[in-house]
Amino acid sequence: ILKKDNYSYISFYNALIHEGYKDLAALLHSGIPVISSSNGGKDSVGGITS
């Protein structure tokens, strides 16, 4: 799953957060891919700004 694409990685991370696996999600947080968006240059994932 982690080799598919950036959105798969982010989706997996968000699922860990949602299901209460914050300790495991914390291990993945540093590897979250940066995805450009039109939100003023700030990238966020699941409400977390990197």
Swiss-Prot record:
Annotated signal sequence range: none
Keywords per UniProt: Apoptosis, ATP-binding, Calcium, Nucleotide-binding
GO biological process, one term: apoptotic process
UniProt entry tagged with the keyword Transport: no
Keyword ATP-binding applies: yes
Stretches assigned to the NB-ARC domain: 46-50
Other remarks on this protein: Physiological concentrations of calcium ions negatively affect the assembly of apoptosome by inhibiting nucleotide exchange in the monomeric form.
Free-text domain note: The CARD domain mediates interaction with APIP. The monomeric form is autoinhibited in a closed conformation through a bound ADP at the nucleotide binding site. Exchange of ADP for ATP and binding of cytochrome c trigger a large conformational change where the first WD repeat region swings out, allowing the NB-ARC domain to rotate and expose the contact areas for oligomerization.
UniProt protein name: Apoptotic protease-activating factor 1
Organism of provenance: Canis lupus familiaris
